């Protein structure tokens, strides 16, 4: 096995002080720092009062395939190569996968210096179930492809996390309403860890209306998983039984949701109203 090694360093999403001591040490001692944006990593090093000791090279999507051979050769010759993305953990919708795969194939040591990730940060503050989740990378840019992608996720039971451009967010949420249903709970996490961090929670219907006014910044979207059809129908039936006994719809939804972990009152309430619209039942609670 080569005496060199590959390090994957997680970088802060917005606050330099979120950098780990291990990342700081690696920036100072690595023989090569392969950065998604060389300007960004130099700015981070300056904020941390660190002098990057090794050679700095670019490693963004369009050049990664061209860099793999040279970086692997350096590692095989004993170099420590540190890979960093602009923000968060390399490889997760960022450069690094090709190099990691090549190093593993070559028997090279690969390790991660763990730290910030927009995926897990958004998930844990979304208020949505986090026991099981899936990450979908960036939403497709084109409308038809995006709608097809969302349609494939319509029956996904796990909470779903994905990235979206602020300029496409409104269109994406409108497509999500169409494909997933407007009652589905979700959260829009914007500018995570930064000065203007914002988390907007609500149904997809509500979030689509909110986003129509325009959104700025780095966006991570978290959407609740689908409830099983039979289970949802059963919950709606339980609510209607409470209503028939004289309990208000909202109170009935609270009672039923409290008895079923993972079910949110608002999600159930919206589902009851949608069911009533579809079956011709009373529109108002």
Swiss-Prot record:
EC numbers, comma separated: 2.1.1.198
Gene3D superfamilies, A to Z: Cobalt-precorrin-4 Transmethylase, Domain 1, Methyltransferase, Cobalt-precorrin-4 Transmethylase, Domain 2
Role of this protein: Catalyzes the 2'-O-methylation of the ribose of cytidine 1402 (C1402) in 16S rRNA.
Family note: Belongs to the methyltransferase superfamily. RsmI family.
Protein name (record): Ribosomal RNA small subunit methyltransferase I
PANTHER family assigned to the protein according to its UniProt record, in alphabetical order: RIBOSOMAL RNA SMALL SUBUNIT METHYLTRANSFERASE I (PTHR46111:SF1)
Places the protein is found: Cytoplasm
Catalytic activity from the UniProt record: cytidine(1402) in 16S rRNA + S-adenosyl-L-methionine = 2'-O-methylcytidine(1402) in 16S rRNA + S-adenosyl-L-homocysteine + H(+)
MF GO annotations: rRNA (cytosine-2'-O-)-methyltransferase activity
Main subcellular localisation: cytoplasm
Gene: rsmI
Family matches, as Pfam families: TP_methylase
Record bears the keyword Transferase: yes
Coiled coil: none
This protein's UniProt keywords: Cytoplasm, Methyltransferase, rRNA processing, S-adenosyl-L-methionine, Transferase
NCBIfam families: 16S rRNA (cytidine(1402)-2'-O)-methyltransferase
GO cellular component, one term: cytoplasm
Enzyme class: transferase
InterPro entries cross-referenced by the UniProt entry: 4pyrrol_Mease, 4pyrrol_Methylase_sf, 4pyrrole_Mease_sub1, 4pyrrole_Mease_sub2, rRNA_ssu_MeTfrase_I, SAM_MeTrfase_RsmI_CS
